[in-house]
């Protein structure tokens, strides 16, 4: 949408004003009376005050919102000041010299910290810290920070925002990330631990806090060089605003940045100093899986069995023999000792079989310095096979000067020559999304293919955007084909998208018929962008060798490959690849006498990753302290059958429905009599325990499992879209009803759960319950339940909310408000880089109560850990369950889940409340999540409960598809639900109600009259 700057400012002012209750939302109907408007104003003010107490996270200033919406990109910022000369001298700011009266962060001045003399400043994870700086001369200054990470409870990436003179210089300054340093914990000889089977054990990655000097740059990799900031001569302020994690800073330097010398200049420079070329020497091989430092804990060694030449290799057991990296700005460092100074060739054995027809890029640093300009553009071309090549940029094989003795060689993941193309495609995606929104506002998401909308007359700018995108994509595809020398998948994808965009731009009557495909191609273009941001490379080893020495072999010959495959085939008959055994069963040759042993089966679609995390935690934090061994098996299916047959594992995970059903069948053990049970359940919200607890046929109220993961609903919204439309962020359903006409007028949608999930949200917020009479019958016939179902149905019938949608609707702003699973949706959205800063999460919408509070209750679903019938040692299993679900272990588990995720902000949906709140949330995220956690409800599981979602979903679909009356549609299914509940209760020998089709529970009755035993 094209708006003037004045229009945007007015829209932003309206948002701020409404946030503070200064304005009400404009009534949907112009016919509203003055008194109605006054009432709406008073009501809005009252709700706003209640929200301030409950939510309290949306107090942005007008300037902050304006910065967020209007901040230019660094690309445009750099062009704007391109003619400004570079800095002539360095300006150093001591971090300890902050301005106290302009600092809100928790700060502490440290002295001589970790070997750095003088003062340094520790800053908390949130709040702002401001410094004064005097600039001697107007110019462009790069900025580098000398810092050390603070080792605390959480270990996500350190994140800050940068403001200069109180303003955001460009949009990328909102996301500055400071990497940590990690090291592997290895045996004294540098080898990995092995388990009792002989497989390598993934090494522990422990944080190694060291001082770093880091130049500020784009964390997504859209720039190879550091940011350059424009400063005028005179006094200025620099402010860091904390988003995640504490940090300790020694100095902030503003300096003149100059690109490195060229490769030719580099060679000539060292030759002029007498450096010689090492023609031949004994090769120095460095195994990639053994770096001495890495930037992310998710950079861990993995196993490759695709080649007999990968080192080390074993046809029988798992050996970690490669390092696989892909995320921009990740790095790994290696120590290399050379016998003499001179120019060497660095050759790598690698495999890049992911980006077909393309190359991935790396930057090499030697002793902390980029040796020459081309060293930031190393290429590793596509091939399905392993390769062995000297480091090169696609044109030249490089030599590198190394000093005699120890050298540090660092490989960093960069976009290399793809930087310009990725940036251009990113800009196109943003422009195409804006054009798509304009089309949707005119036609809706599914325009009539035979209608003349007059696109070129009504929204000519959007049509021109499509044409421009086609031209740009064709040009990018041609340039990529030229530099790669082939028409790969990625180039072909761009050409395909360009063809459609070209067709639509040249003939406006092709827009409506191809509109759905147009949307899909925008998403596909965005996915192309993400694929390009990913720079996968499997590295086996690299060799420091003479420039004339032969390269190490890349691909195994026929006999090597055949022998390896034959050996692996015969070994497969004797090796157990499903068991991930404990680290040792003997110490100094003496068998360990464990006091208990637990066997656990993991059904994992993620392969061995989940099991390896469990193995690491158990071996380091459970077995050494409990003297209980845990055996882990990774299986693909068969858990249910094994447990029911009594031959399953000692511990298992299952959903709440199965937990109760199997508990009633005595297939899993109740936990109430276990030692410490009453204390353990206090670790969880009552809502998480309720679905795992039930009264059995003997009248005993028993809990059959402990919750491990928990899902609940929250609201996600597009800040930019609501601000641009001048709409306040809704807090109640009434707020939503008020803004829906505005959204619908723009053909925008709201995302809501359907069927039983959606019904339960309204039902429990209105004060109802799903079951009545202790689970003997369904409560959907009550007035509250029927009202809840009516409200859900109205959202889809009257307000046309879509039944089928996906996260891409939110991504394109076609759906600016989405109610969905909190943690899963959060993790997904954090992966969409183009949405950085454009969305937020908030507590669920709710109903205002008489006291002015808002009921934002969210139903909860849980997965539990249980003790199956036939467990060999239930007491040992219970000890493991207590340890596993404890706050300390769940925090460690969350860290390990983060360590295997390339997304530095990934969250783990633990059911342990304290552990969940201990994750590295931003201040606003923490307030939103902690607020929602106060309003959770667990829905009990009863015999026959499996049938409820089937009938409720059918009732919902009959209303949505066939136009049935919601009340009638629900009432028609109540008897069938009750009959199934009674049938299952009878099967379990529990009290039940005799149900007939003549019975009706729409009116008050005494269920005891129909009670049977």
Task: Please annotate each region the language model reported.
Residues 36-544, 549:
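Extracytoplasmic
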Residues 37, 41, 421-427, 432-661, ...:
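Conserved N-terminal structural module of periplasmic/extracytoplasmic solute-binding proteins
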Residues 574-596, 659-714, 737, 838-852:
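Hinge/lid segment of periplasmic solute-binding proteins
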Residues 618-687, 720-728, 814-817, 830-834, ...:
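Extracytoplasmic "Venus flytrap"/periplasmic binding protein-like
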Residues 663-666, 686-729, 734-737, 748, ...:
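Periplasmic solute-binding protein
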Residues 775-803:
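Glycine-centered hinge/linker elements that transmit conformational signals in sensory
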Residues 794-879:
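Extracytoplasmic/periplasmic substrate-binding proteins
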Residues 844, 895-958, 990-1012:
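Long, aromatic- and glycine/proline-rich binding clefts that accommodate carbohydrate-like moieties
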